[in-house]
Amino acid sequence: VHFTAEEKSVITGLWGKVNVEETGGEAVGRLLVVYPWTQRFFDSFGNMSSPSAIMGNPKVKAHGKKVLTSFGDAVKNMDNLKGTFAKLSELHCDKLHVDPENFRLLGNMIVIILASHFGGEFTPEVQAAWQKLVAGVATALAHKYH
């Protein structure tokens, strides 16, 4: 994936304003609510019996923070997403057996959360750059599957 200087600027500019803990927890929580079959990867997370239980679950929030922190690595390494996510790709493929489609779904959740948090600042141009980034991360995470 090649990012233009403008795309990089738009992504890093917004990233500097992102609350990683809040956004990450909300993105993973939404993923688990909207796509309930993804819950099977999180059996150890305890109560996920309802949307409010999922959104308030401390383990969901903690994992969300971890996920979004790794997105920070993507922002810093846009020119080497495959290398940046090689170890995580291996973990999710070989050990956890996560369906790579879930990475795309999570990326879309992140874009939705950013749009809701940043409103008018999340212009179509900003969205286009972020969609490109989350798609690049999803592809990098799925790399070990091919």
UniProtKB/Swiss-Prot annotation:
Keywords, in A-Z order: Heme, Iron, Metal-binding, Oxygen transport, Transport
MF annotations from Gene Ontology: heme binding; hemoglobin alpha binding; metal ion binding; oxygen binding; oxygen carrier activity
InterPro entries (UniProt xref): Globin (IPR000971), Globin-like_sf (IPR009050), Globin/Proto (IPR012292), Hemoglobin_b (IPR002337), Hemoglobin_oxygen_transport (IPR050056)
Superkingdom of this protein's organism: Eukaryota
Biological processes annotated in GO: cellular oxidant detoxification; hydrogen peroxide catabolic process
Binding site for heme b: 63, 92
Transmembrane segments: none
SUPFAM superfamilies associated with the record: Globin-like (SSF46458)
GO cellular component terms, A-Z: haptoglobin-hemoglobin complex; hemoglobin complex
Pfam families in UniProt: Globin
Ranges where the Globin domain occurs: 2-146
Family statement: Belongs to the globin family.
Other facts: Hemoglobin theta chain is an embryonic beta-type chain.
Listed name of the protein: Hemoglobin subunit theta
